Amino acid sequence: MFEQGLILSAYLLCVGFFGLITSRNMVRALMSLELIFNAITLNFITLSNLFDNRETGEIFTLFVIAVAAAEAATGLAIALSIHRNRRSTRIDQSNLLKW
């Protein structure tokens, strides 16, 4: 069970990084970032079951879920604002911070 959790976590992390690097759409990049956060939480739970009591891993997991929810809400609000102004959510067309 331990190895399966780590393999699934590594797979989610690789898919998330690949999606983050190759995506041109902001929403797709946010979804890839959420996959990375899910891989982190799966690692916390898997490793806490092996090395420590479960409470420590669950506390860190709840913290990561809270950070991921705040990141998703902020990212979607920014993507919606850029879509309203630029009519596109492509990352390469979003040059709002350039002088």
UniProtKB/Swiss-Prot annotation:
It catalyses: a plastoquinone + NADH + (n+1) H(+)(in) = a plastoquinol + NAD(+) + n H(+)(out); a plastoquinone + NADPH + (n+1) H(+)(in) = a plastoquinol + NADP(+) + n H(+)(out). Its main location: plastid. InterPro entries: NADH_UbQ_OxRdtase_chain4L/K (IPR001133), NUOK/Mnh_C1-like (IPR039428). GO terms for cellular component: chloroplast thylakoid membrane; NADH dehydrogenase complex. One of its GO terms (molecular function) is quinone binding. The chain crosses the membrane at residues 1-21, 31-51, 59-79. Keywords: Chloroplast, Membrane, NAD, NADP, Plastid, Plastoquinone, Quinone, Thylakoid, Translocase, Transmembrane, Transmembrane helix, Transport. Pfam families: Oxidored_q2 (PF00420). The keyword Translocase applies. The keyword Metal-binding does not apply. It is a multi-pass membrane protein. Its EC number is 7.1.1.-. Gene3D superfamilies: 1.10.287.3510. It comes from the Eukaryota. Coiled coil: none annotated. It is found in: Plastid, Chloroplast thylakoid membrane. Disulfide bonds: none annotated. GO terms for biological process: ATP synthesis coupled electron transport; photosynthesis, light reaction. NDH is composed of at least 16 different subunits, 5 of which are encoded in the nucleus. NDH shuttles electrons from NAD(P)H:plastoquinone, via FMN and iron-sulfur (Fe-S) centers, to quinones in the photosynthetic chain and possibly in a chloroplast respiratory chain. The immediate electron acceptor for the enzyme in this species is believed to be plastoquinone. Couples the redox reaction to proton translocation, and thus conserves the redox energy in a proton gradient. Belongs to the complex I subunit 4L family. This is NAD(P)H-quinone oxidoreductase subunit 4L, chloroplastic. It comes from Adiantum capillus-veneris (Maidenhair fern). The gene is ndhE.
